[in-house]
């Protein structure tokens, strides 16, 4: 669907273009997978709920692809804009009629005062480059991308990478938020790390950000600890692998709870040591303890770790069989974090993180996990 056709379609939706006020804040979404679509649904609902704050249209960048729909080949954007449903990535969930799928990423960027990033982390730099020269000077961003970029020399938040490559201030949203459950409006909480007075535009306050995301089923808490929010979503995956190892060994819930507690302490220590994070962010907020519990009770990291122990197969084989070759976040993060800690001479201070790495990559027997921690 062309941008011209999209504009024509959106103009027909209540003639909302005619009532546009420059004072209203325009919201754009970068990404349209299951989580991106769920976030777009929330933003669309809140754009309608707060007509005094937000422009009624929410444009979601959707990578154009052909799909089979009702017996014929169609563009995914056309199907979405006709049915208000992402039939490929979030089937069965209706989005508000004011959310539009837009295949032109620069058009989405140029429209947006608040740009919400919800896409796989490996595409962040590429998308930043595609958006150069089209963004509003006072626009801000919110990253819903879980994980961190780790090398031997440094740990970088994806919010920092977005800031460095676009010039936009970037906050972080993270929590115990399974996309399908959020889309089904099952109650959950989330945490947004966002600094007050961070934007050159005084309109983009923490209260504005909260108004954009808070729903009766999606409770938002704003904190000033941006790195703490981001790190919780990354490091909990390592702990989830450890929890899966415990379940694979059938050592029981008491043991798993102990491993989760030790893992949380290492998450807090890592945040304090390298980012000056606030300890309470991980022990009290959804981005920390709640996300850790959810991930350790289920999910891909836990599932693959259980299979790794029970089958004795290498993790890359388990990934191939259970994830169709996708890389397991917890295992990959464990390797990256270990190499970083080794370079910092801090390996001994993080025994659980180190044990997960050595079990997955160096052949340490899984039953040695408890001895190691």
Swiss-Prot record:
Reaction catalysed by this enzyme: sn-glycerol 3-phosphate + NAD(+) = dihydroxyacetone phosphate + NADH + H(+)
Enzyme category, top tier: oxidoreductase
Binding locations of NAD(+): 31-36, 123, 146, 179, 300, 329
Subcellular location: Cytoplasm
InterPro entries named among the record's database cross-references: 6-PGluconate_DH-like_C_sf, 6PGD_dom2, G3P_DH_NAD-dep, G3P_DH_NAD-dep_C, G3P_DH_NAD-dep_euk, G3P_DH_NAD-dep_N, NAD(P)-bd_dom_sf
An example Gene Ontology CC term for this record: cytosol
Positions with a binding annotation for substrate: 146, 300-301
GO process annotations (BP): glycerol biosynthetic process; glycerol-3-phosphate catabolic process; glycerol-3-phosphate metabolic process
GO molecular function: glycerol-3-phosphate dehydrogenase (NAD+) activity; NAD binding; protein homodimerization activity
Pfam families, A to Z: NAD_Gly3P_dh_C, NAD_Gly3P_dh_N
Signal sequence residues: none
Keyword set, alphabetical order: Cytoplasm, NAD, Oxidoreductase, Phosphoprotein
Residues with Phosphoserine modification: 15
Major localization class: cytoplasm
Positions annotated as active site in the UniProt record: 236 (proton acceptor)
EC number, as in UniProt: 1.1.1.8
Protein family membership: Belongs to the NAD-dependent glycerol-3-phosphate dehydrogenase family.
Full protein name: Glycerol-3-phosphate dehydrogenase [NAD(+)] 2
Organism, as annotated: Schizosaccharomyces pombe (strain 972 / ATCC 24843) (Fission yeast)
Source organism phylogeny: Eukaryota, Fungi, Dikarya, Ascomycota, Taphrinomycotina
